[in-house]
Amino acid sequence: MGPVSTSRRGLRLGISLILLQVGVVGACTVSVLQPGYLEVDYTSQTVTMECTFSTTGCPAVQPKSLWFRCGTHQPEALCLDGCRNEADKFTVKETLDQNRVSLTVNRLSPNDSAIYICGIAFPNEPVPTAKQTGDGTTLVVRERLFSREVHSLLIVLLALLAVYVTGVCVIFIVLFRSKSNTPRSRETKEDSKKKSARRIFQEIAQELYHKRYVETSHQPEQDGNYENRKALPSPGRP
């Protein structure tokens, strides 16, 4: 942060010298505000940087706005002629009654990356505070990494990937539910088989018990008949 702040101070000193040429140093206070950073894609074609200011103790006259660009070279004054034509590289729009000015960079290219500084000056005021600059807006113009065709293709691929992932999730859920239901069905079948086997076993046991009961009930009757036959005299014997 040290070297950057030092370089910016040097830039502001150099720009202040340019502002001093606009009017004699001498009575009001101006404060200038700018966004510190702005990053755009060069395919945007245009970019606008805003600058707002406030005044204290200054006369009721319109101040003069100036723009400077600081790149790899010395500070460069922009739009000294006003830059009112939108066909130009730079276009300045002033709304001084609202304390607002803006600079639009047309036909963007990566070479437009620089620090753009807004300056507001009351030329007829003798004090240095009547001529002030903002801290500057660092504009970064990025080259587009992909063409429109590649960008569209990536969107389509992402959509297909989303559909594929959704389908896989649905299949996984269905398989998981079917597997969780299979053991239950198997248990139900095994339980029914066990119940039917128990029922058959009980029926066989009841049948055997019934037969045994019938046999045991007939056995005393047969024994009684046999004894009665022995007790009876045989015919033909005196």
Swiss-Prot record:
Cytoplasmic side: 175-238
Side of membrane Extracellular, spans: 28-153
Entry keywords, A to Z: Disulfide bond, Immunoglobulin domain, Membrane, Signal, Transmembrane, Transmembrane helix
Residues covered by the Ig-like C2-type domain: 30-134
Covalent S-S links between cysteines: C51-C118
Region of interest: Disordered: 215-238
One GO CC term on file: membrane
Localization per record: Membrane
InterPro entries: Ig-like_dom, Ig-like_dom_sf, Ig-like_fold, Ig_sub, Ig_V-set, IGSF6
Compositionally biased intervals (Basic and acidic residues): 215-230
UniProt cross-references to PROSITE patterns, sorted A to Z: IG_LIKE
Pfam family, any one: V-set
Membrane-protein topology: Single-pass type I membrane protein
Signal peptide range in chain numbering: 1-27
TM ranges: 154-174
Protein name: Immunoglobulin superfamily member 6
Lineage of origin: Eukaryota, Metazoa, Chordata, Craniata, Vertebrata
Gene that this polypeptide is encoded by: Igsf6
